[in-house]
From Swiss-Prot:
Name this protein carries in UniProt: Protein Red
Keywords, comma-separated and alphabetical: Acetylation, Chromosome, Cytoplasm, Cytoskeleton, Isopeptide bond, mRNA processing, mRNA splicing, Nucleus, Phosphoprotein, Repeat, Spliceosome, Ubl conjugation
Skewed-composition ranges (Basic and acidic residues): 16-25, 304-313, 332-398
Modified residues (Phosphothreonine): T485
Ranges annotated as biased composition (Basic residues): 294-303
Subunit architecture: Component of the spliceosome B complex. Interacts with SMU1. Interacts with MAD1L1. May interact with DHX15.
Length: 557
């Protein structure tokens, strides 16, 4: 057949020796397309002999591989699935043998699991269907027998619903089983102990010629190491007794067990010798001597002054007559406690000496500050004060009568001047209290202005207050330990004010411009002080006028 219809084709030629002269045979031998189709449709006959195989001398012989053969692969797969199916069938057969259709058994009434319990549970069945007398009698007897057995004999732990306090027989039965099990276990535990006891002592197998050899053997091989109880180490366990309790005599003491780290180790106790004790005490004494003989450096301001001698009581040791400590090899606990007490007393005495030195230094500092303040008070005078020939303060410490005389003399001296507002800077702050009546502190305005007397001494414009000026590090800053309490130190630090020298030389630069050193602060407090002085002067004037008998105009309030 041609591959395409457009290509020309011709029928094949007749074979050699074929004669086509006969027209009839020619017409018969002429084949058509129909004949060719039939030829194709007819199956090929099986060959009687195998066709000659082609000679493949030029190709290499190839081994047969079963994996590449599709037929072999199909056979393998079929056999594999056949095995799986066979295994499933066998498993189903096993399950079918074990399986019980309990629902079918209950329907047929042949369920063996519930034969015993059905007799007890089906009480209502006797009333539903009227049984025969014989069946009723046998069923009732059987049921009564089961009840009696369960009551007196007790069931077993698996099939009995236990009720606390009711199953007496079962309880006794279980107790007996437990006791028998415990007895068996004890016997099993005792058996190996008895067997070990029966073992022969190895010492009997050895023959000793001398007693010394036997003793050496026993010391080497039979010496048992003593078992130490860890709770009974030195200092490990102690008894705590509450002595304040009323029933301390009869009460059981509490046991206190300390940690191993808190207890002294046995090695440290055994290795400590007398030489170690002596060395430790010597180092301690030398450290005390080093601390006690330390000389204190004198400050710059104290260099010119003579050193104040310490009173002999300060250096007196309370253990002066005891003598030097000589350690002994064996010390009783009481001696150790006494020694510790002495050491504590020495430490306390040393601390007291140091505290006395500090207190003495602080007292000197305070005294110097007081002297400096007195000198500054002498230099200072009020703006309103009249000039005096003698600036020395009057001595008012002559007794209670001298203060009254002083007030009287001042009143007589300044009786004529109604607007006198000055005050005198006195030596001690107690004098201000004594002169309180003169300045009107006893009148009704005193409680409104409690700080009047302290603020009346206004600095003069002519002189500069150098107390706040930074004097450099001549005196040295006062530290925390120069004060007794933290509150005093905090108050000192809060009130501390120091301006540089440049502020007194060139003035302080403020927001409104540079102010000179004659700068005087005008605030509300100063204004109130001035008004109070005027009011107090008017009140004093009226009092004097009333005392003289002059009629004074009284306010209407």
């Amino acid at each position: 057949m041609p591959e395409r219809d457009s290509e020309p084709f011709s029928n094949p030629l007749a074979p050699d020796g074929h004669d086509v002269d006969d027209p009839h045979s020619f017409h018969q031998s002429k084949l058509t397309n129909e004949d060719f189709r039939k030829l194709l449709m007819t199956p090929r006959a099986a060959p009687t002999s195998a066709p000659p195989s082609k000679s493949r001398h030029h190709e290499m012989p190839r081994e047969y591989n079963e994996d590449e053969d599709p037929a072999a692969r199909r056979r393998k797969k079929k056999s594999y699935y056949a095995k799986l199916r066979q295994q499933e069938i066998e498993r189903e057969r096993e399950l079918a043998e074990k399986y019980r259709d309990r629902a079918k058994e209950r329907r047929d009434g042949v369920n063996k699991d519930y034969e015993e319990t059905e007799l007890i549970s089906t009480t209502a069945n006797y009333r539903a269907v009227g049984p025969t007398a014989e069946a009723d009698k046998s069923a009732a007897e059987k049921r009564r027998q089961l009840i009696q057995e369960s009551k007196f004999l007790g069931g077993d732990m698996e099939h009995t619903h236990l009720v606390k306090g009711l199953d007496f027989a079962l309880l006794q039965k279980v107790r007996a089983e437990i006791a028998s099990k415990e007895k068996e276990e004890e016997e099993l535990m005792e058996k190996p102990q008895k067997e070990t006891k029966k073992d022969e002592d190895p010492e009997n197998k050895i023959e000793f010629k001398t007693r010394l050899g036997r003793n050496v053997y026993r010391m080497l091989f039979k010496s048992k190491s003593y078992e130490r109880n860890e709770l009974f180490l030195p200092g490990r366990m102690a008894y705590v007794v509450d002595l304040d309790d009323e029933y301390a005599d009869t009460d059981i003491p509490t046991t206190l067990i300390r940690s191993k780290a808190d207890c002294p180790t046995m090695e440290a106790q055994t290795t400590l010798t007398t030489n170690d004790i002596v060395i430790s005490k010597l180092t301690q004494i030398l450290s005390y001597l080093r601390q006690g003989t330390r000389n204190k450096k004198l400050k710059k301001k104290d260099k010119g002054k003579l050193e104040e001698k310490k009173p002999p009581e300060a250096d007196m040791n309370i253990f002066e007559d005891i003598g030097d400590y000589v350690p002994s090899t064996t010390k009783t606990p009481r001696d150790k406690e006494r020694e510790r007490y002495r050491e504590r007393e020495r430490d306390r005495e040393r601390d007291r000496d140091r505290e006395r030195d500090r207190e003495r230094d602080r007292e000197r500092e305070r005294e110097r500050d007081r002297e400096r303040e007195r000198e500054e008070e002498k230099k200072r005078h009020s703006y309103f004060e009249k000039p005096k020939v003698d600036d020395e303060p009057m001595d008012v410490d002559k007794g209670p009568g001298s203060a009254k005389e002083l007030i009287k003399s001042i009143n007589e001296k300044f009786a004529g001047s109604a607007g006198w507002e000055g005050t005198e800077s006195l030596k001690k702050p107690e004098d201000k209290k004594q002169l309180g009546d003169f300045f009107g502190m006893s009148n009704s305005y005193a409680e409104c202005y409690p700080a009047t007397m302290d603020d009346m001494a206004v600095d003069s414009d002519e002189e500069v207050d150098y107390s706040k000026m930074d004097q450099g590090n001549k005196k040295g800053p006062l530290g925390r330990w120069d004060f007794d309490t933290q509150e005093e130190y905090s108050e000192y630090m809060n009130n501390k004010e120091a301006l540089p020298k440049a502020a007194f030389q060139y003035g302080i630069k403020m927001s409104e411009g540079r102010k000179t050193r004659r700068f005087k602060e005008t605030n509300d407090k100063a204004e109130l002080d001035r008004q109070w002085k005027k009011i107090s002067a008017i009140i004093e004037k009226r009092k004097r006028m009333e005392a003289d008998g002059v009629e004074v105009k009284r306010p209407k309030y």
